Amino acid sequence: AVTQLTQAPSNLSWSPDGSQIAFSMFTPKSKPAPVSLPGKPEGANWTEAPKYVDKDNYRFDGGGYAKDGHQQIYVMPATGGSPRQLTDDEFNHGGQLAWSPDSKHIFFSANRRDDAFRQPVNSEIYRLTLSSKEISAVTDRNGPDSSPKVSPDGEKIAFTGYDDTKMSFQASNLYVMDLDGSDV
């Protein structure tokens, strides 16, 4: 193993120069309770502590309570070592990761809206700059944009998605655009 992780990594992606591996991983993040509870008296036999819920999607059918945390993006040296966390937001950053040919940017799909739970299929393609951890949207469409892939010359991005018309089924299309999000 090139590193020891506390959670399972997914969406592995080698940098074009071969020096780094990017991946996403669930990262737990506990939130403090809004009130402090009294301490347990000596000898008391209490049940487990109450769960503090502050989000709409806190429980899954058959899966119990959702863990606090989100899928975050990491990068680490391909030779091994400690991963460096690149995202730390209240959004899931899972899905395919695509490197720019110069290994300076990673493109990914995510729903980073405040109302993401109410608009689950409204994702965009984002560019993450490794040196600054700056994230900028490349697409801004109504519907899911996913699976970004940068062209070998670094000029274009291919991705899949559709314009959401709120139908029960919509087929995804293949799109190609300039690296800055123009000319879709």
Residue ranges of predicted features:
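Conserved beta-propeller blade repeats
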Residues: 6-24, 50, 60-65, 73, ...
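A short beta-strand motif characteristic of beta-propeller blades
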Residues: 1-3, 84-87, 134-139, 183-184
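Predominantly five- to eight-bladed beta-propeller fold
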Residues: 26-74, 109, 119-124
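Residue-level signal for beta-strand positions within conserved beta-sheet cores that form or flank
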Residues: 69, 82, 121, 134, ...
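Proline-centered turn/helix-capping motifs that create local helix->coil transitions or kinks
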Residues: 29-31, 77-78, 166-167
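Short loop/turn segments that connect beta-strands within beta-propeller blades
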Residues: 77-81, 129-133, 178-182
